[in-house]
Amino acid sequence: MPGRQRRDGGNGPAGQNSNGPEGRDNRRGGGDRRGGGDRRDNAAEKNQLERVVAINRVSKVVKGGRRFSFTALVIVGDGNGLVGVGYGKAKEVPAAIQKGVEEARKGFFRVPMIGSTITHPVQGEAAAGVVMLRPASPGTGVIAGGAARAVLECAGIHDILAKSLGSDNAINVVHATVAALKQLQRPEEVAARRGLPLEDVAPAGMLRARAQAAGGAR
């Protein structure tokens, strides 16, 4: 029958190429490549630092009464200069934290550093929050409050002086700290913009710390 001949023809050499062992192996190989990428991404995410700064319960008044949900402010970083802040909202606390983590990863940014501290003093503002950051010598540690400390530690900054000059609200402090970190510049960028050699822009102590950090990296 014509229909049977068409089905039999699908099992010929052409059919074997698409549905036989070789075709299955090719498809399986492509899946392995994709799976390998996923595994690498998952491994990188597992090595990231996560800090939950604040969890709040909020309510919404509707016709049937009140609907309660939770918000979570989360900091995520790789401990090596990469950090992000996320704000999640859900009916359950774990779901709110997970949403905050995902949002923080989408907003990753790189923090310029020299060794274990920042490149220069800076001040950031967000709403009523004002945070001042100053570089510190090795061994000083992170001198900062809870909300700012979470951001700095996730970014991988080990020596720094931080002071909150405005609101003590955790959300304002976190966003002010992030605003300060985003203002940091590398000495090379400043020297290139001014058209001057690096020695005329960066202090001698910064150059020594930079050289020591480069030597330790080797």
Curated annotation (Swiss-Prot):
Q: Which GO terms describe its biological process?
A: translation
- The S5 DRBM domain covers 48-111
Transcription in keyword set:
no
Q: Where is the composition biased (Basic and acidic residues)?
A: 22-45
Q: Which Pfam families match?
A: Ribosomal_S5, Ribosomal_S5_C
Where does the source fall among the domains of life?
Bacteria
User: Disordered: where is this region?
Assistant: 1-45
**rRNA-binding among keywords:** yes
Which molecular function terms from Gene Ontology are attached? rRNA binding; structural constituent of ribosome
Keywords for this entry? Ribonucleoprotein, Ribosomal protein, RNA-binding, rRNA-binding
Annotated Gene Ontology cellular component terms: small ribosomal subunit
- PANTHER family on file: MITOCHONDRIAL RIBOSOMAL PROTEIN S5 (PTHR48277:SF1)
Q: What is known of its domains?
A: The N-terminal domain interacts with the head of the 30S subunit; the C-terminal domain interacts with the body and contacts protein S4. The interaction surface between S4 and S5 is involved in control of translational fidelity.
Sequence similarity? Belongs to the universal ribosomal protein uS5 family.
Summary of the function given for this chain in its UniProt record: With S4 and S12 plays an important role in translational accuracy. Located at the back of the 30S subunit body where it stabilizes the conformation of the head with respect to the body.
Q: How does it assemble?
A: Part of the 30S ribosomal subunit. Contacts proteins S4 and S8.
> What protein name does the entry list?
Small ribosomal subunit protein uS5
Q: What is the scientific name of the source organism?
A: Nocardia farcinica (strain IFM 10152)
Write the lineage as a comma-separated list: Bacteria, Bacillati, Actinomycetota, Actinomycetes, Mycobacteriales
